From Swiss-Prot:
It comes from the Eukaryota. CDD domains: cytochrome_b_C (cd00290), Cytochrome_b_N (cd00284). Belongs to the cytochrome b family. The chain crosses the membrane at residues 33-53, 77-98, 113-133, 178-198, 226-246, 288-308, 320-340, 347-367. Its cofactor is heme b. It is a multi-pass membrane protein. The keyword Ion transport does not apply. Heme b b566 binds at H97, H196. GO terms for cellular component: mitochondrial inner membrane; respiratory chain complex III. Heme 1 (or BL or b562) is low-potential and absorbs at about 562 nm, and heme 2 (or BH or b566) is high-potential and absorbs at about 566 nm. The cytochrome bc1 complex contains 11 subunits: 3 respiratory subunits (MT-CYB, CYC1 and UQCRFS1), 2 core proteins (UQCRC1 and UQCRC2) and 6 low-molecular weight proteins (UQCRH/QCR6, UQCRB/QCR7, UQCRQ/QCR8, UQCR10/QCR9, UQCR11/QCR10 and a cleavage product of UQCRFS1). This cytochrome bc1 complex then forms a dimer. This is Cytochrome b.
Amino acid sequence: MTNIRKTHPLIKIVNHSFIDLPTPSNISAWWNFGSLLGLCLIVQIVTGLFLAMHYTSDTMTAFSSVTHICRDVNYGWLIRYMHANGASMFFICLFLHVGRGLYYGSYTYFETWNIGVILLFTVMATAFMGYVLPWGQMSFWGATVITNLLSAIPYIGTTLVEWIWGGFSVDKATLTRFFAFHFVLPFIIAALAMVHLLFLHETGSNNPSGLISDSDKIPFHPYFSIKDTLGFLILILIFMTLVLFTPDLLGDPDNYTPANPLNTPPHIKPEWYFLFAYAILRSIPNKLGGVLALLFSILILMLFPILHMSKQRSMMFRPLSQCLFWILVADLFTLTWIGGQPVEYPFITIGQVASILYFSIILILLPFASLLENKLLKW
């Protein structure tokens, strides 16, 4: 008798994706982040669903409803902090996942990579709208500042901003629609993640050497299912340590003050995972220029397949490119630090230098280093 796992129309899809999937035998722990992102998404959807049962998206009661969740709902504090810190874990895994893709040349799978960049944008939009929902000071002013950036678009800017707001300022209409979008987007993310996997399984996984590994593949289960489970346990350990010991470590104290349109906080800044983009935005004195730089700082990822000049796929055997890659990582840390600092000397200058370096490495230095390596390695 044939195995139902291999014949049933639905179960066989799962089988080909997670059980009998041919996987390169040499993929390292850097390949764990895809499954960790799946775990983060499940945690966020489940905790978010329970929060939505108690939350009210009204300017008068939103802040109080979050307080009610933390004080009166059974384990509400746990659900709330898991959801808030779950976003941070999500972005840590996302950045490491993208970094792995850049280092090992995974971007040569065009479709998988481009869907991944769209996923990154969608997750960022979802996180931004989620940050507005508790209706604290930083929620309100963050929403005001970031949505206001759209007014830099010539001709239609102001109309567009008022259309998004649903009025002449961030108010009840804005909060309600942000809640609606924040609720629905994770399900769209889940659908996009399935498309991401679909395209990945068309080509098969990349591996650290960047070479074709068809001759050396092993089944996903039990080898990599066990490896992924270890990753899950490590992630849960770090995540729950953060949630149970220092739940407010990555948050902003200003968000414990209810939103007040008449009182601006001294330093308006987004959550830590947006600070690098915020620093790039602030480093350009022109409003439209800043908005374009902000957009391009993420969209630039889509150019990587075009800018790949090396005759080798991975950076594993390319020391010059490796060096530039780690300078880029250090530069992103610098930008993240600058994004959280006040707009004054010397932070403005450091931010501008770091922003120029960010775009220079990606657009000029990496392609040039790749061509040089081709010459040096006699390709």
